[in-house]
UniProtKB/Swiss-Prot annotation:
Keywords of the record: DNA damage, DNA repair, Endonuclease, Hydrolase, Metal-binding, Nuclease, Zinc
Annotated protein name in UniProt: Probable endonuclease 4
Key word Ion transport present: no
Keyword DNA repair: yes
PANTHER family assigned: APURINIC-APYRIMIDINIC ENDONUCLEASE (PTHR21445:SF0), ENDONUCLEASE IV ENDODEOXYRIBONUCLEASE IV (PTHR21445)
EC number: 3.1.21.2
Catalytic activity reported: Endonucleolytic cleavage to 5'-phosphooligonucleotide end-products
One record GO biological process: base-excision repair
Organism: Mycoplasmoides gallisepticum (strain R(low / passage 15 / clone 2))
CDD domains in the record: AP2Ec
Residues annotated to bind Zn(2+) 3: 191, 235, 237
Homology family: Belongs to the AP endonuclease 2 family.
Amino acids binding Zn(2+) 1: 78, 118, 154
Length: 303
């Protein structure tokens, strides 16, 4: 299984001024990554910088110079956290929709094929089914007003009133989408583990996903370990191999023949380095994954 090759392996990078995407791809190259994910603006804010300032052409040229031209549009924009298309309050849902629609258009302008969306929470509704119906309705409306971008609904940890922690709920929404070429799934390993699915049973889990949802809808993997026991419903990411899922289980999953061709994105915690301050371990984690060898001592496991 681990003889399979992972093509798109990357991490979250920040879209910071003044270089925006050019700065992002420089970081990607430095990390040894072959894909990446970013927010097009602050995830907890409605403020946005025009996409014309993101230096997309320079970023594409930089990728080509470093032999990453085949990345093409296989990178990911993550939706801001303020969007909840499942809200039963029509005024709040409409505000979310307008922000969502703008983000979809920005994603297309920034050349990304995939847009990852947290499905939302069942607020101001009688039950989760009503929340799922609201989500499907708004997704269809947005898809009819945009083009190309594939919306990937993220598997959630079942924390609070979250929807789509169960594969069946994702399938319920997908079944209602008119243009199924525009809908997909982002599989978050921490969230799935925290929702009660067992990543130690790789083949069984993949088969179950395929039977309920269909592997053809799986486009993006968020690769995270978990600080919590399976089924905790808490959503606390851990660095790869330093959590309750474990290095070997995560490797067995991502090197599986049905998974290794997906876009795999690290979203793991940063560490507090006494010299460098707060820094990510993405470069080290990518090396561990490529080398298929766990490195101890990178994280203070008491933290």
């Amino acid at each position: 299984m681990k003889s399979n090759k992972i093509k798109y392996l990357g991490c979250f990078v920040g879209a910071t001024k003044p270089d925006f995407m050019l700065g992002m791809v420089k970081t990607v190259v430095d990390y040894g990554a072959t894909s990446f994910m970013f927010y097009s603006g602050p995830p907890q804010s409605f403020r946005r910088t025009p996409t014309a300032q993101f230096k997309l052409d320079l970023a594409k040229a930089y990728l080509a110079k470093h032999n990453l031209g085949d990345l093409g549009d296989n990178y990911v924009v993550h939706a801001p956290y303020l969007i909840n298309l499942a809200n039963g309050d029509s005024t709040k849902r409409e505000r979310s929709f307008n922000f969502f629609l703008d983000e979809l258009k920005r994603t297309n302008e920034l050349g990304a094929k995939y847009f990852v969306l947290h499905p939302g929470s069942a607020l101001n509704v009688k039950d989760k089914t009503q929340a799922l119906d609201h989500l499907a309705t708004e997704l269809n409306r947005a898809i009819s007003m945009t083009k190309d971008t594939i919306i990937c609904l993220e598997t959630m940890a079942d924390k609070g009133q979250q929807i789509c922690s169960k594969f069946e709920e994702l399938r319920y929404v997908i079944d209602q989408i008119s243009d199924k070429s525009r809908i997909g799934v982002c599989f978050d390993t921490c969230h799935v583990h925290d929702a009660g699915y067992d990543l130690a049973k790789t083949q069984e889990l993949i088969d179950h996903f395929d039977q309920v949802i269909g592997l053809k809808y799986l486009y993006v993997i968020h690769l995270n370990d978990s600080k919590n026991p399976m089924g905790a419903r808490k959503d606390r990411h851990a660095n790869i191999g330093y959590g309750k899922i474990g290095f070997e289980n995560l490797l067995n999953f991502i090197y599986h023949k049905e998974i290794c061709n997906k876009i795999i994105i690290l979203e793991t915690p940063w560490i507090d380095d006494p010299i460098r301050g707060e820094v990510p371990l993405y470069k080290e984690e990518i090396e561990m994954i490529r080398n298929k060898k766990f490195v101890e001592g990178l994280v203070n496991e008491e933290s």
